[in-house]
Amino acid sequence: DFSAPQFRVDESDPNSPSTVFKANELRAVYSVTGAYPAMLGLDLSEIETGRECYSIQQAIEWHKAGGIVTLCWHWMAPTQTEGKRHFYTEKTDFNLKQALENPGSAEYQGLLHDIDLICAELQKLQEAGVPILWRPLHEASGGWFWWGASGPKAYQSLWSLMYDRMTNVHGLNNLIWVYNGQDPKWYVGDERCDIIGDDPYYTNGSRVAYYFDSANANRFKTCYK
């Protein structure tokens, strides 16, 4: 049996779960179905900029209640330019290809620094025995996030860097790696991911067509063997 945990809320803190997560959506689902969703999706965004992270404790509580946790990371680009730390390509000047080609650069070291910060948070989940569906660097082929703005080779190199650092340097073994690059040309390889996913979007088309796209996502070829 699963019962959604009651997350503590600090109404005086604008960055607390009161503005990020109040479980309102969960209660709405329960009010209609009489049951809570089994899976909770959380984001580690802005840990790398010094913002306090509530997602880790929420993940632990959700796991203790019998739920499944999936994490993504809207990574604020590690640029050295003031005011340009953002995950959207159009709002940052960070060049992934250049950073990867220059391991001694501040930009490359920024990549490692941010990954290490996230690893410290993920380590807390490993110590608590929480398995995570880890979905980093998502929707890369769309180009709207900086990690996809330099093309598939740079993206694959960044994925490999992250995978190696998290797995071999930090020893994280509680991560189930989810590839969500949206395009077979961007695939990171069977040895570096466990699950393949896709994000269909509803724009101005038919809602019925959107539903069938979502329901039949397993028919889309999103990777090559």
Which residues does each PLM region occupy?
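N-terminal module-boundary/linker segments of secreted carbohydrate-active enzymes
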Residues: 1-43, 56-60
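Solvent-exposed loop/turn segments at secondary-structure junctions
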Residues: 2-4, 45-48, 75-78, 138-142, ...
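Surface-exposed substrate-engagement region within the catalytic domains
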Residues: 12-19, 26, 31, 165-225
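A conditional alpha-helix N-cap/helix-loop micro-motif detector
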Residues: 19-22, 52, 111-115, 213-216
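Flexible, charged surface loops at secondary-structure boundaries
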Residues: 31-36, 63-64, 126, 189-191
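Structural recognition of the beta-strand scaffold that forms the well-ordered cores
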Residues: 37-43, 68-73, 132-136, 176-179, ...
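Substrate-binding cleft of extracellular glycoside hydrolase catalytic domains
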Residues: 45-161, 165-168, 172
